[in-house]
């Protein structure tokens, strides 16, 4: 989104249009490289060389769909749409991609709670409902429908997610402040050996396995969840004011 905004603010129409084309290209390449036809979801990452220890040697994809990675992706698509001019001809390509991704997100929404599991393509008692990605998805569903890029059915899914967030993840503390619980603190992949990795800084624990994701700490009030929760709350406030 910053790349789009900077181009539109500082460059001529022709140069800004070329930068918007680059933004669309990058987003579509991410779809092409990380989409998994078997699950209908997007993998956490892709290695162009197919050589990293966490990557599938055939297609370069990591093993699983990490919910927050997909949350970052769909938020980026939507925020780029938000700043792209309506007469930009390739805007429709991103609208179609947003609809495709959010359809898959809704299909993987937990039926009981309305929120999402940390690793979206694994059904296991060890998996857990995770708040930061759930806030991201709720925000995109609510804002995307308000902006007309997603249908009203998606708004209903976003409202259900928001209620699930309030019920499952929001704790009222003794001093009457709020806490957002069940935040994945961090997850990543590697790095392994490489020309830009200092010797001794490799991290082979982060191998992209399900057990790896489950080994990362869970905390309260991670800013990567608080921000999207505030944004989703503002969307609900606008909806309720109608």
Language model features by range: what are they?
Residues 1-15, 72-90, 135-150, 228-241:
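Well-ordered alpha-helical scaffold segments within catalytic/enzyme domains
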Residues 78, 82-89, 99-114, 121, ...:
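Short helix-capping and hinge/turn segments at secondary-structure transitions, especially at repeat
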Residues 7-18, 27, 56-60:
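Active-site cleft segment of glycoside hydrolase catalytic domains centered on the general acid/base Glu
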Residues 38-63, 83, 111-123, 183-217:
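Extended glycan-interaction surfaces of carbohydrate-active proteins
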Residues 123, 129, 133, 138, ...:
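CBM-like carbohydrate-recognition segments
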Residues 20-43, 48-54, 95-113, 157-175:
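Long, well-ordered core segments of solenoidal/helical folds
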Residues 14, 54, 73, 99, ...:
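A structure-centric feature marking long, well-folded core domains of fungal metabolic enzymes
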Residues 54-75, 86, 90, 109, ...:
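Solvent-exposed loop and edge beta-strand segments that line ligand/cofactor-binding
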């Amino acid at each position: 989104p910053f790349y789009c905004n900077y181009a539109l603010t500082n460059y001529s129409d022709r140069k800004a249009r070329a930068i918007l084309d680059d933004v669309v290209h990058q987003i579509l390449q991410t779809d092409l490289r990380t989409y998994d036809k078997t699950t209908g979801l997007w993998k956490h990452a892709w290695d162009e060389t197919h050589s990293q220890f966490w990557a599938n040697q055939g297609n370069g994809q990591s093993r699983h769909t990490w919910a927050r990675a997909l949350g970052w992706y769909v938020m980026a698509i939507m925020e780029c749409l938000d700043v792209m001019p309506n007469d930009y001809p390739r805007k429709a390509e991103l609208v179609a991609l947003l609809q495709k991704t959010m359809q898959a997100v809704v299909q993987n929404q937990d039926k009981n709670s309305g929120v999402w599991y940390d690793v979206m393509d694994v059904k296991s008692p060890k998996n857990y409902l995770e708040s930061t990605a759930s806030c991201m998805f709720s925000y995109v569903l609510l804002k995307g429908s308000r902006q007309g890029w997603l249908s009203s059915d998606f708004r209903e899914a976003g409202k259900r997610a928001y209620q699930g967030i309030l019920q499952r993840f929001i704790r009222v503390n003794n001093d009457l402040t709020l806490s957002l619980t069940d935040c994945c603190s961090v997850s990543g992949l590697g790095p392994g050996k490489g020309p830009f990795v200092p010797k001794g800084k490799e991290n082979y624990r982060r191998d992209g396995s399900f057990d790896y994701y489950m080994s990362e700490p869970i905390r309260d009030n991670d800013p990567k969840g608080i921000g999207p929760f505030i944004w989703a709350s503002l969307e609900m406030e606008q909806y309720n004011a109608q």
